[in-house]
């Protein structure tokens, strides 16, 4: 039963990535991934969904939210997240105050 559940999770994630993310429909991808992550899934599926959400947020310029996603899965995907964390940090700038 666990294996069947994992196959279903994999299928849903791949559908989101191939049908929306690949077509640069980032707002739709973000919503689909947030919906996916709101349901109880395996740790592996949650980690992958969180990573994909980070990428989606990054492409929308939501650097702080993207950074948060990448930091959540940094231990799981160290090689992949290192680059994306740096990109998010480069894009994210603290607001400057003028005195």
Residue ranges of predicted features:
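Alpha-helical segment of the N-proximal tetratricopeptide repeat
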Residues: 8-35, 39
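Short solvent-exposed coil/turn linkers within tandem alpha-helical repeat scaffolds
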Residues: 6, 39-45, 71-84
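Alpha-helical linker/edge segments of TPR/alpha-solenoid repeat scaffolds
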Residues: 55-68, 88-99
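Long, contiguous interaction/recruitment modules in multidomain scaffold/adaptor proteins
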Residues: 1-5
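Surface-exposed, polar/charged faces of alpha-helical domains
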Residues: 27, 31, 44, 63-68, ...
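TPR/TPR-like alpha-solenoid helical repeat scaffolds
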Residues: 47-51, 79-98
């Amino acid at each position: 039963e666990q294996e069947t559940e994992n196959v279903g999770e994999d299928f849903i994630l791949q559908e989101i990535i191939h049908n929306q993310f690949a077509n640069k429909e980032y707002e739709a991808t973000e919503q689909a991934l947030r919906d996916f992550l709101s349901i109880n899934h395996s740790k592996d599926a949650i980690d992958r969904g969180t990573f994909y959400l980070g990428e989606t947020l990054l492409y929308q310029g939501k650097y702080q939210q993207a950074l948060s996603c990448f930091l959540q899965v940094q231990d799981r995907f160290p090689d992949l997240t290192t680059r994306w964390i740096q990109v998010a940090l480069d894009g994210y700038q603290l607001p400057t105050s003028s005195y």
